[in-house]
Amino acid sequence: IFGEWKTSNNFIFGIXALVIIMVGVIXTXYTEKGDGFTQKTTNKDILFLVLTTXGYLAYXAXPKTITADAESMFLPQTLGILLGSVIYLAFSGNKAAFKEKASYLDLFAGISFGIAAYAYIIXAQVNGVTNAFIYGQLSVIISTIGGMTLLGERKQGKELVATLAGLCLIVVGAIL
C-alpha cells in the first residue's frame, strides 16, 4: 500500500511476518473455557469495532500520507484520539465517566500512550508504516509479561503455553 515492499520477496516475508505476529497476539489472549465469564457480542459492539478500526487505520497511515514532520502531526492526531474517545463515551451511554475520579487517574496511562504514539510517528517516518507497526506490536510482549509479573495475572496450563508460544511468534514475526 505504501510502496515500502519493493520486491516480491519483501512482500512475501512482510505478509508472513504480519500473519505470524497476528497469530501470536491472538495466542496471548487465549483463555480456557469454563472460567464463568461469557459476553454476548452485540451489533453496537461490532459497529464500535469497525469505527475504531477505521480510526486506527487513519491514525497509522497518516505519517506516510502527508509530508510534515512528526512534531506537527502529533497535536492533530492527539486531538483526533480525544475526539474519538468523547464520541465513544457519548454514544455508549456512559456519560458519568466524565465525572469519575478513575477517568482522571487514567490520564497517566494516556500520557504513557502519548509518548508511545509520538515514538510511533517518528518510527513510521524513519522506518515506514509497516516496520513501525511491527515494532509497535513488540509492546504486547512487555504488557503481557508485565501483566503476569507486576499485576499478578494468573495463567496456567494451556493458557500459559499459548501465551508463551504467542510471545515467541511475535518475536519471530518481528525478526522476519
Swiss-Prot record:
Which family is this protein grouped under? Belongs to the GRP transporter (TC 2.A.7.5) family.
Subcellular localization is given as:
Cell membrane
Where mainly found? Answer: membrane
Q: How does it sit in the membrane?
A: Multi-pass membrane protein
Q: Which UniProt keywords apply?
A: Cell membrane, Membrane, Sugar transport, Transmembrane, Transmembrane helix, Transport
Q: What is this protein called?
A: Putative sugar uptake protein
- For the keyword Membrane, the answer is yes
Q: Which residues cross the membrane?
A: 10-29, 46-63, 73-92, 104-123, 133-152
Q: Which InterPro entries match?
A: Sugar_transport
Drop me one GO molecular function for this one.
Answer: carbohydrate transmembrane transporter activity
Q: Which GO terms describe its cellular component?
A: plasma membrane
So which domain of life are we looking at?
Answer: Bacteria
| Keyword Methyltransferase appears in the UniProt entry | no
